[in-house]
Amino acid sequence: MIKTVKDVNLKDKRIIMRVDFNVPMKDGVVQDDTRIRAALPTIKYILEQGARSLVLMSHLGDPSKDAKKAKEKAEKDGKPFDEEAYINGKHRMKPVAEYLSGLLKLPVDFAPSCMGQLERVKALPQGGILMLENTRFHKEETSKEKAEQQILAKELSLYGDIYVNDAFGTAHRSHASTAEIANFVNTRVAGFLMEKEIKYLEPMLNNPAKPMTAIIGGAKVSSKIAVLESLLKNASSLIIGGGMAYTFLKVQGKKIGKSLFEEDFMDTAKNLLDKAEKQGVKIILPVDHICSETFSPNAEAVLVESTDIPDNLMGMDVGPKTLALYKEIILSSKSIVWNGPVGVFEFEAFSKGTEETARLVAAATEKGALTIVGGGDSVAAVNKFNLADKMSHVSTGGGASLEFLEGKVLPGIACLDTI
């Protein structure tokens, strides 16, 4: 078990804490504060315990990569591009520090860099909070060279006696502020958000209450194959939806019309189906579809009542017969993990499958099942349908929760002290 902030004495200690404040920004204004609010319990606890100071660090997008993409798009559209204004509007932590200050009703000081801030840290009043600038303004943060990462990690380690990692969303990244820093601080513990994520995800991987159902959706088999393989070990049923379902249907010799499929992953999909059959895991693929002729929000929805899709159509969502199968399985499950939508829920006409899946998972939760929703799109879906609070746990880490469920060791967790 990893140690948390509750396992160490924080009184009069200087704390350096990695948070995940990678929030959507527009013109220097926070658009969604979910991730900031998620860190508040740990921040408040540290302050209540009488810490000497609290230094917070986070990335906020990837300034150089994002600016390069935005510049290319502007050039393509024949529009002017002001790189400095773009970065100031999207990647600066100062507005986040001000926003946090408003939530805490406490002053939050801001440092314009992650390097050379020791005097500023020392000058903080008792219980003072300092927010460092975006860690990714320093190339050392994400460097592939360990020695280069260590330059930033050593500097950051000077700001605290205790390192707290509460950024589950970046726990799968081996960066200077998420893992390397732990080599230069004697006490390394998890915050409450990190602890909560592990508490809910670990049983799904190692010892879930049976029957256990995994609902895996999204566009590509390639990005989900490792999690499918991993969940196969414990799942009683595997519901495969979204764009990736058509690769599996094609393997079974079904007609998929113009639907998305991955030629290169046909063999992988076939092996997975064979493995599931050997292990007695029930695989549920769509038996009917909501289709359209084009991939667009205004496309006309066409119900195809069979598994085979006509040549002129593409699958966009699951149909009512498929949802009836989902209902039977989901409502009889004791644990459920859901990663990825089962249709193009962003388009109103093709959102029913994902909405109904969310409602079924919520109903199973009410019946006592342990339910976890992870992955950006499925989280966005439960939020869209106002069902997030009806799930046992909605994970804050897209890639991190996926890698955790794949059974991978996450650097941001592996670097912490254990009991």
From Swiss-Prot:
Binding site for substrate: D20, F21, N22, R35, H59, L60, G61, D62, R136, R173
Keyword flag Cell membrane: no
KW Kinase (keyword) present: yes
Subcellular location: Cytoplasm
Major subcellular location class: cytoplasm
Protein name per UniProt: Phosphoglycerate kinase
Gene: pgk
EC annotation from Swiss-Prot or TrEMBL: 2.7.2.3
The family this protein is said to belong to: Belongs to the phosphoglycerate kinase family.
Pathway assignment: Carbohydrate degradation; glycolysis; pyruvate from D-glyceraldehyde 3-phosphate: step 2/5
Subunit field text: Monomer.
Binding site for ATP: K224, G315, E346, G375, G376, D377, S378
Catalysed reaction, written as an equation: (2R)-3-phosphoglycerate + ATP = (2R)-3-phospho-glyceroyl phosphate + ADP
GO annotation terms (biological process): gluconeogenesis; glycolytic process
Family annotation (CDD domains): Phosphoglycerate_kinase (cd00318)
Species whose genome carries this gene: Treponema denticola (strain ATCC 35405 / DSM 14222 / CIP 103919 / JCM 8153 / KCTC 15104)
